[in-house]
């Protein structure tokens, strides 16, 4: 789902934190402490 894709994306960028939200069928992802 959205959260797992976001987590994998941020992990790939070596970010320590991440946050995701689904809105109107779209996945929004934000990576922190990269």
Swiss-Prot record:
**GO terms for biological process?**
defense response to bacterium; defense response to virus; innate immune response; regulation of defense response to virus
Q: Which domain of life is it from?
A: Eukaryota
Which cysteines does the record link by disulfide bonds?
2-27, 6-29, 10-31, 15-34
The GO cellular component terms are:
extracellular region
Q: Where does it live in the cell?
A: Secreted
Question: Keywords of this protein's UniProt record, alphabetized?
Answer: Antibiotic, Antimicrobial, Antiviral defense, Antiviral protein, Disulfide bond, Immunity, Innate immunity, Secreted
| Chief site of localization | secreted
Chain's role: Has antibacterial activity against A.viridans, B.megaterium, M.luteus, E.faecalis, S.aureus and E.coli. It is active against the marine species A.carrageenovora, P.alginovora and C.drobachiensis.
Q: What is this protein called?
A: Mytilin-A
Q: Which organism is it from?
A: Mytilus edulis
């Amino acid at each position: 789902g959205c959260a797992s894709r976001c987590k994998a994306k941020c992990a790939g960028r070596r970010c320590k934190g991440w946050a995701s939200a689904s809105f109107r069928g779209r996945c929004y992802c934000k990576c922190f402490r990269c």
